[in-house]
């Protein structure tokens, strides 16, 4: 029978529940168990696809085209699995589906209520995550903190799961903060005690506590927490601040986190072989070089807005024994007058995805600088589109060239709306989303980046595409269309082969990068940038 692990949080948000859940998932997977993981977000949006990155951070896209919370990126990178639409569920999605059933008459005239209809829908999503993947273990993280009014239906559903499945088949983990008061030189357990008290008031007794802390907790403190919160002392897991998040699975393994869970489930499994992870973590802590990458984007003020890009750069750097010094530059600040000052010390320039016209000219200026000065360049999604526009303006001489998204009246719409998007009215969930095949042209930089594979599957999130009526003119000036859809209609990758590295993709390669298996384009980009990387002092 499938076993279910529920991860909740208390005291403060952004406490690291997702990393804890992903770390446990990796340990259980390495013990030979099939694991899947999901995130419930209490907000009323159906998905994060229409939310500002400043509000929510990055939108992560799964193979099946679901726009999800950025925590799913952590899940995939840590556990090395591909997730699906059941891996991210919001209050908005639950209510939308319940209301659709009510309109169809599925409830046979019953009064539709939070209990049982909403809670049953939540439980169905939990069960589906396991049945659709045939998993041994389902890990479910609840966003926000216990006590938030928005999360109450989810907490109630988790409580009911124990009655539905039996206590031997569910395991509750509660993550909390132990604040350190520098003035007093003390760590305080009271917030954790109150958070657990709140959780217990909703009918859930946690089996394990994960306490986030700046300082190591003492045995006395561990026993105190265990006594007041009614858990075993060994089930109080310390989560210290670390230099790299890839230390966390090893840290919690040392505290027998995975074994405690399996003992509760009465599941026998060999000890997790984490030798590859140990090597990775040691390598990450001892990198000998530094590569400076300039990321020119729209949402640089928020760290999480480009989290998958940041992690993909790091993964590629690890294989080159290089730490990535990421210099985030607001595209709005880049002008022809200051571009040398802003980008002159960069070993590579990356322009990521985005939407809208704000900062567009700054991105084009940065791309022009990379092309004219032969600085390794990687463009992603909008970055690829603007690389095409820059080439049209400054190489083909089409001075008013633009994207129809930015300037609908441009005489040279190098980037145009996709035909199947013309009658689309809703914004949410209507883009070209998910994994699609990209056919690579043999002998190109892109093909070599993927070890000369003929076709690669990559994830997309866009409405606009390269306008094929400009393909011939650009090719005549040296641009190579090295990746296309299998029918050759949609341009997926462009490159300038005479440059050290100048490649841009319509798809989002960052979503498939793994810490021990960097994505091809990122690896090739960092390899090129590494030629000017600096040895660490």
UniProtKB/Swiss-Prot annotation:
Gene Ontology annotations of biological process type: 'de novo' CTP biosynthetic process; pyrimidine nucleobase biosynthetic process
UniProt keyword NADP present: no
Region (Amidoligase domain): 1-267
Molecular function terms from GO: ATP binding; CTP synthase activity; glutaminase activity; identical protein binding; metal ion binding
Classification via NCBIfam families: PRK05380.1, PyrG
Remaining remarks: CTPSs have evolved a hybrid strategy for distinguishing between UTP and CTP. The overlapping regions of the product feedback inhibitory and substrate sites recognize a common feature in both compounds, the triphosphate moiety. To differentiate isosteric substrate and product pyrimidine rings, an additional pocket far from the expected kinase/ligase catalytic site, specifically recognizes the cytosine and ribose portions of the product inhibitor.
Protein name: CTP synthase
């Amino acid at each position: 029978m499938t076993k279910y692990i529920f991860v909740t949080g208390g005291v403060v948000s952004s406490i690291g529940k997702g990393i804890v859940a992903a770390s446990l998932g990796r340990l259980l997977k390495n013990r030979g168990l099939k694991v899947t993981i999901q995130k419930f977000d209490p907000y009323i949006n159906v998905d994060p696809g229409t939310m500002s990155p400043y509000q929510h951070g990055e939108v992560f896209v799964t193979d099946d085209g679901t726009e999800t919370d950025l925590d799913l990126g952590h899940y995939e990178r840590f556990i090395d699995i591909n997730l699906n639409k059941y891996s991210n569920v919001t209050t908005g999605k639950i209510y939308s589906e319940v209301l659709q059933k009510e309109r169809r008459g599925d409830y046979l005239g019953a009064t539709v209520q939070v209990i049982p209809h909403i809670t049953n829908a939540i439980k169905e999503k939990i069960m589906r995550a396991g049945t659709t993947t045939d998993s041994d273990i389902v890990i479910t993280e609840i966003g926000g903190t216990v006590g938030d009014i928005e999360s109450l239906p989810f907490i109630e559903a988790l409580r009911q799961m124990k009655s539905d499945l039996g206590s031997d088949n569910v395991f509750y983990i509660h993550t909390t903060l132990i604040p350190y008061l520098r003035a007093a030189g003390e760590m305080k357990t009271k917030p954790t005690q109150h958070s657990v008290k709140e959780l217990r008031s909703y009918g859930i007794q946690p089996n394990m506590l994960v306490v986030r802390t700046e300082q190591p907790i003492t045995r006395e403190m561990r026993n105190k927490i265990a006594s007041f919160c009614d858990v075993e002392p060994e089930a109080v897991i310390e989560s210290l601040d670390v230099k790299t998040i890839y230390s966390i699975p090893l840290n919690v393994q040392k505290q027998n986190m995975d074994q405690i869970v399996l003992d509760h489930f009465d599941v026998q499994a060999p000890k997790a072989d984490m030798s590859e992870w140990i090597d990775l973590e040691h390598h990450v802590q001892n990198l000998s070089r530094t590569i400076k990458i300039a990321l020119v984007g729209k949402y640089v003020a928020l760290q999480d807005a480009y989290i998958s890009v940041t992690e993909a750069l790091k993964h590629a750097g690890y294989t080159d024994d290089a730490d990535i010094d990421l210099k985030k530059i607001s595209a709005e600040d880049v002008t022809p007058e200051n571009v040398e000052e802003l980008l002159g010390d960069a070993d590579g320039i990356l322009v990521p995805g985005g939407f809208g016209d704000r900062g567009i000219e700054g991105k084009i200026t940065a791309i022009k600088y990379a092309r004219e000065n032969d600085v390794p360049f990687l463009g992603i999604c909008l970055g690829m589109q603007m690389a095409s526009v820059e080439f049209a303006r400054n190489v083909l001489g089409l001075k008013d060239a633009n994207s129809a998204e930015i300037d609908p009246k441009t005489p040279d719409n190098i980037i145009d709306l996709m035909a199947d998007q013309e009658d689309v009215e809703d914004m949410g969930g209507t883009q070209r989303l998910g994994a699609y095949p990209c056919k690579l042209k043999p002998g190109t930089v892109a093909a070599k980046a993927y070890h000369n594979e003929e076709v690669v599957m990559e994830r997309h999130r866009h409405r606009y595409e390269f306008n094929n009526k400009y393909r011939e003119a650009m090719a005549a000036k040296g641009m190579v269309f090295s990746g296309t859809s299998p029918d050759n209609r949609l341009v997926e990758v462009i490159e300038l082969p005479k440059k050290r590295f100048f490649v841009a993709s319509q798809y989002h390669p960052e979503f498939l990068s793994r810490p021990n298996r960097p994505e091809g384009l990122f690896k090739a980009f960092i390899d090129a940038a590494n030629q000017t990387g600096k040895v660490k002092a």
